[in-house]
């Protein structure tokens, strides 16, 4: 079971971070579809308002991440 602080590999093929490793920021237990929030070192391509920075977190389902040691 993934928990906060776990290192995980992303299995969602359409994700920008597919096969990348990130750190679990939180796991929501309320029953939502994508409860695992993962933070990454690199940002994606979607900078906001002309800012050079993009998004570095994303939500995933439990079966879209695998914990690594």
Curated annotation (Swiss-Prot):
Stabilizes the interaction between PsaC and the PSI core, assists the docking of the ferredoxin to PSI and interacts with ferredoxin-NADP oxidoreductase. The lineage of its organism: Bacteria, Bacillati, Cyanobacteriota, Cyanophyceae, Oscillatoriophycideae. It comes from Trichodesmium erythraeum (strain IMS101). The gene is psaE. The keyword Transcription does not apply. InterPro entries: Elect_transpt_acc-like_dom_sf (IPR008990), PSI_PsaE (IPR003375). SUPFAM superfamilies: Electron transport accessory proteins. Keywords: Membrane, Photosynthesis, Photosystem I, Thylakoid. Belongs to the PsaE family. This is Photosystem I reaction center subunit IV. Pfam families: PSI_PsaE (PF02427). It is found in: Cellular thylakoid membrane. GO terms for biological process: photosynthesis. It is a peripheral membrane protein. GO terms for cellular component: photosystem I reaction center; plasma membrane-derived thylakoid membrane. Its main location: membrane.
């Amino acid at each position: 079971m993934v928990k906060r602080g776990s290192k995980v590999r992303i299995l969602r093929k359409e994700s920008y971070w597919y096969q990348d490793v990130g750190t679990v920021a939180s796991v929501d237990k309320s029953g939502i579809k994508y409860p695992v929030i993962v933070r990454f070192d690199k940002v994606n391509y979607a900078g906001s308002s002309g800012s050079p920075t993009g998004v570095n977190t994303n939500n995933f389902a439990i079966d879209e991440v695998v914990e690594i040691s």
